[in-house]
């Protein structure tokens, strides 16, 4: 059960990571190890995005903000997206409307794409997510 919960959080983290308006020097693309780090950073968001809490916790906000500052390049965004797609297959209970609320409630400047297990990661563009299609 812990694996499913952790995988669900990858959805939030990777989506929030695509917030940069500029392309910094490339860093290693998120792989399996990075997906684990993403999960660790945003684990506190699970209760909020499943509708079990009215507000995201302080830990949820700090973890998602940290992640949004780390994943910047198009390749990093696409790799994180692939991680989300793998992690969300078969997971239920995540409410997309609440995922979209995390940045607003945490005062993180971003626009999020749809968070689904079949999202086409190749649609992710280079800057902010408003241009992901």
UniProtKB/Swiss-Prot annotation:
It comes from Parietaria judaica (Pellitory-of-the-wall). This is Probable non-specific lipid-transfer protein 2. The keyword Phosphoprotein does not apply. Keywords: Allergen, Disulfide bond, Lipid-binding, Signal, Transport. GO terms for biological process: lipid transport. Belongs to the plant LTP family. The keyword Transferase does not apply. PROSITE patterns: PLANT_LTP. One of its GO terms (molecular function) is lipid binding. Disulfide bonds join 35-83, 45-60, 61-106, 81-121. PANTHER family: NON-SPECIFIC LIPID-TRANSFER PROTEIN 2-RELATED. It holds the Pfam family Tryp_alpha_amyl. InterPro entries: Bifun_inhib/LTP/seed_sf, Bifunc_inhib/LTP/seed_store, Plant_nsLTP.
């Amino acid at each position: 059960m812990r694996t499913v919960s952790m995988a669900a959080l990858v959805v939030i983290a990777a989506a929030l990571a695509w917030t940069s308006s500029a392309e910094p020097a490339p860093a290693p693309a998120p792989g399996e190890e990075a997906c684990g780090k993403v999960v660790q950073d945003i684990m506190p968001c699970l209760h909020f995005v499943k509708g079990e809490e009215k507000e995201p916790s302080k830990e949820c906000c700090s973890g998602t903000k940290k992640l949004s500052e780390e994943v910047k390049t198009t390749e990093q965004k696409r790799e994180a997206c692939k991680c989300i797609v793998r992690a969300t297959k078969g997971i239920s209970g995540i409410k997309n409307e609440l995922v979209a609320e995390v940045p607003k409630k945490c005062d993180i400047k971003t626009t999020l794409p749809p968070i689904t297990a079949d999202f086409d990661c190749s649609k992710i563009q280079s800057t902010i997510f408003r241009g992901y299609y």
